[in-house]
Swiss-Prot record:
S-adenosyl-L-methionine binds at residues 112-113, 164. Pfam families: SAM_MT. SUPFAM superfamilies: S-adenosyl-L-methionine-dependent methyltransferases. It comes from Legionella pneumophila (strain Paris). Its main location: cytoplasm. The lineage of its organism: Bacteria, Pseudomonadati, Pseudomonadota, Gammaproteobacteria, Legionellales. The keyword Nucleotide-binding does not apply. The gene is rsmJ. Its EC number is 2.1.1.242. Keywords: Cytoplasm, Methyltransferase, rRNA processing, S-adenosyl-L-methionine, Transferase. This is Ribosomal RNA small subunit methyltransferase J. Specifically methylates the guanosine in position 1516 of 16S rRNA. GO terms for molecular function: rRNA (guanine-N2-)-methyltransferase activity.
């Protein structure tokens, strides 16, 4: 499964909605496809052979349960998300790290360049109720992070840019979750990760945080690192930062 080529739908009442999405993403409409973006009455999902339906979820109920344990996570220790802090998640993926950061009060903008993943994230955002929106400040721009940063004015620089590049080593472990397996196959390796890190350092106020496999050499020597069991969080400080 290298790429999604079709949009499917659960029943004929959803055909028009599926067709609109297929046209938007330049995909085929195929109700019988076994690998596709799949429209159900409740949500947009990813249908992959031998997997259950997968979808993004930004309900406050789901993520508030993880907030307590999140305080001990390297992600939180590295990014230090608090109310009023502006964070760009430059490689949003399924949006899970972005959601965790948002539960701590940060204003998180997700950037996702893969159209299929961006569609899944957008659908998850659209399903939120008012309580979800109040508790988690999340937004999305379907864009390549490098292009987006190039277009950014200095007054709009975020406090933190978080980067979780797709790395081949991440897919070799039997412990890799199904969502990461699918993301790896769908997106592939982020070969422009070095370029993104360097560009981020000139477009951020406080720090750049990179999630990277624990035993793999960093792309750039970090100013600090927070180690986990299988990954670490490398921290890079821009030269002009006062933090």
């Amino acid at each position: 499964m290298n790429r999604i080529k079709a949009v499917g739908y659960e029943n004929n009442e959803l055909k028009e909605k599926a067709q609109l999405l297929a046209d938007q993403l330049n995909l085929q409409l195929d109700q019988n496809a076994d690998t596709c973006l799949f429209v159900t009455p409740e949500k947009l999902t990813l249908k992959i052979r031998n997997f259950s339906l997968m979808f993004a979820d930004f309900s406050a109920m789901t993520w508030s349960k993880r907030r307590g344990e999140g305080k001990k996570q390297g992600l939180i220790r590295a990014c230090k998300p608090t109310k009023g802090i502006k964070i760009f998640d430059a490689t949003a993926g399924w949006g899970k790290d972005a959601a965790i950061l948002a539960t701590f009060g940060a204003d998180v903008l997700m950037l996702e360049r893969h159209p299929v993943m961006a569609a899944l994230l957008a659908d998850a955002l659209s399903r939120r109720n008012e309580a979800d929106i109040q508790k988690m400040c999340l937004s999305l721009i379907a864009s390549d992070a490098i292009s987006f940063l190039h277009s950014l004015q200095e007054k709009d620089y975020p406090d933190i840019i978080y980067i979780d590049p797709m790395h081949p080593e991440r897919n070799k472990s039997a412990l890799v979750k199904k969502e990461m397996q699918v993301l790896q196959q769908l997106i592939g390796t982020d070969y422009d990760a070095m370029e993104l890190i360097k560009l981020s350092l000139s477009h951020v106020k406080s720090r750049v945080v990179v999630k990277w496999p624990q035993k793999v050499k960093p792309l750039l020597p970090p100013d600090a690192s927070i180690d986990g069991k299988t990954v670490r969080f490398d921290i890079y400080m821009p030269q002009f930062s006062s933090n």
